[in-house]
């Protein structure tokens, strides 16, 4: 269920192991030329099928949360900036990560494999906006804290299409990045290493079937041990309903979609952990716009530089791309004109470690949220605002928080948790092999399984967790080496070489 960073890994690795794999994806499939040319093209950017919009991003506004999530074949990779950073090691030593494992060392080989398949590299060129971030760091007393971002983007000759440069000819042809800055609108060049260019492409070569515009609505276990997955195909008034039968089900619809599907299926899952919905997190994100008349952030990818003033805080320089932008409706800090807002505006995205969280509930057909503990998800981060205001000083501009202060709600593009992994059913939804407690043939392999805030963009970590989970699966014709649920954890040595299918 889902074709994002968890579902795409599962599709490839399980197809390689001899399973018959079907991927169900609520959104449509995309070609580079189908993506929006401007952020004003809502029907190509936003997912609102009741309006006829079938874009790559779904915006959900609730009483305590605003979340932006990806939709389409490739999931969040269609709308993400392509950033691949590993969390600070201290993240994995927080209490929310099950102490049974040394997570930093456990995930190290999975991170390395994920970086190879996703084509992780350093941004090779910097522009004026990046230089301002370096000067800001120096003014804050951390001159060595700015680095080029690590991203999954092909930096070949700009705009030139070449045969597959990543998988010995098994992947699709690719074009070099033109540094237009529109990565988050969907890459029209074909340079961003979205999942349709790697994991999903290889999964289809291995025999996996992908069904776009098909939404999973309900999971029902059967007496013979199989599952019935009730789906709905299409986005119009007339939709086709189909029931799929499977021996194993992987939930990978993202932190929102997976939690919502399990909440909706709860009447049929009496043994489901009461921890469902807990530890839902925003990654503690805040967005600030810094703009000035006469300033030009310069060409580049959507996120080109990162500043780490403290080990628990990351601030990233983001571009909107040239032209006007809907963000101007919420923040016009450097003058009254909306003209060319994207060119003269740097957006600073801050992420902070910390144990704040929400709990999701299912009400009237959708998720609602309540505080999950004494520490609320932040609307503002003083340390991030200090960076934004100092950046503004360097360009004689002004800084303004974007969505957070206007909506007075936590805003995230990286929703995490809700189905956390752990060894105890009382505090986790799935075990350390990602099998749902009480239902060992049901698996959670996506951002919903992440038990804590990461303080960095989560795509690489979700991919690494998925690689680790799938490596422990047996081949279709081999016995399962994982211990039965209820037995003590035992490390299962899986293959993380990624040699199958050239990946």
Question: Which positions does each model-derived feature cover?
Answer:
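Intrinsic disorder at enzyme termini
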Residues: 473-502
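A short acidic-Thr-Gly-centered motif at the start of a beta-strand
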Residues: 11-16, 199-204, 234-243, 421, ...
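FAD cofactor-binding and catalytic pocket of flavoenzymes
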Residues: 61, 76, 80, 92, ...
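N-terminal glycine-rich phosphate/pyrophosphate-binding loop and immediately adjacent elements
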Residues: 1-95, 99-101, 105, 231, ...
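A glycine-rich dinucleotide-binding beta-alpha-beta segment and adjacent secondary-structure elements
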Residues: 149, 180-183, 220-221, 379-452
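Conserved redox-cofactor binding core of oxidoreductases
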Residues: 103-213, 406-413, 420
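Glycine-rich loop(s) and the adjacent beta-strand/alpha-helix scaffold that form part
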Residues: 16, 20, 27-32, 37, ...
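Short, hydrophobic/aliphatic alpha-helical segments
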Residues: 53-69, 239-246, 309, 404, ...
């Amino acid at each position: 269920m889902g074709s994002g960073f968890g579902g795409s890994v599962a599709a490839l690795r399980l197809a390689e192991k001899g399973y018959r794999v079907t991927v169900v994806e609520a959104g449509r499939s995309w070609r580079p030329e189908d993506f929006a040319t401007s952020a004003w093209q809502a029907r190509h950017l936003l997912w609102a099928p009741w309006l006829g919009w079938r874009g790559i991003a779904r915006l959900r506004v609730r009483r305590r949360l605003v979340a932006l999530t990806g939709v389409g074949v490739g999931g969040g990779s269609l709308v993400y900036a392509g950033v691949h950073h590993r969390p600070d090691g201290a993240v994995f030593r927080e209490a929310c990560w099950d102490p049974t494992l040394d997570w930093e060392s456990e995930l190290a080989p999975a991170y390395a494999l994920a970086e190879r398949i996703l084509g992780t590299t350093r941004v090779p060129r910097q522009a004026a906006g990046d230089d301002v971030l370096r000067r800001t760091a120096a003014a804050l007393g951390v001159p060595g804290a700015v680095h080029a971002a690590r991203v999954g983007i092909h930096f070949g000759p700009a705009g030139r299409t070449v045969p597959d440069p990543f998988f010995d000819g098994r992947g699709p042809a690719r074009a070099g990045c033109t540094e237009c800055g529109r990565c988050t609108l969907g890459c029209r060049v074909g340079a961003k290493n979205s999942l349709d260019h790697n994991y999903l492409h290889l999964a289809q070569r291995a025999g996996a079937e992908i069904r776009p515009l098909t939404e999973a609505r309900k999971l029902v276990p059967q007496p013979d041990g199989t599952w019935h997955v009730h789906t709905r195909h299409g986005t119009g008034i007339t939709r086709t309903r189909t029931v799929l039968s499977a021996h194993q089900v992987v939930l990978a619809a993202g932190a929102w979609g997976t939690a919502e599907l399990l909440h909706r299926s709860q009447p049929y899952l009496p043994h489901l952990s009461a921890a469902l919905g807990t530890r839902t997190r925003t990654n503690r994100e805040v967005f600030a716009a810094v703009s000035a008349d006469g300033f030009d952030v310069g060409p580049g990818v959507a996120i080109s530089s990162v500043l780490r003033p403290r080990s628990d805080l990351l601030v990233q320089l983001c571009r909107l791309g040239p032209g006007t932008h809907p963000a101007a409706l919420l923040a016009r800090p450097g003058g009254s004109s909306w003209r060319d807002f994207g060119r003269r505006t740097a957006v600073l995205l801050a992420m902070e470690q910390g144990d704040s969280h929400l709990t999701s509930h299912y009400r009237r057909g959708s998720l609602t949220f309540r505080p999950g503990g004494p520490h609320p998800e932040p609307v503002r981060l003083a340390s991030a605002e200090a960076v934004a205001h100092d950046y503004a000083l360097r360009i004689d501009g002004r800084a303004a928080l974007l969505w957070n202060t206007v909506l007075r709600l936590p805003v995230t593009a990286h929703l995490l948790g809700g189905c956390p992994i752990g060894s105890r059913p009382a505090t986790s939804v799935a075990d350390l092999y990602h099998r749902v407690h009480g239902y060992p043939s049901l698996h959670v392999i996506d951002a919903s399984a992440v038990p804590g805030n990461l303080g960095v963009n989560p795509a690489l970590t979700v991919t690494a967790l998925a690689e680790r989970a799938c490596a422990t699966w047996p081949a279709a014709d081999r016995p399962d080496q994982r211990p039965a649920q209820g037995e003590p954890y035992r490390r299962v040595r899986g293959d993380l070489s990624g040699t199958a299918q050239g990946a």
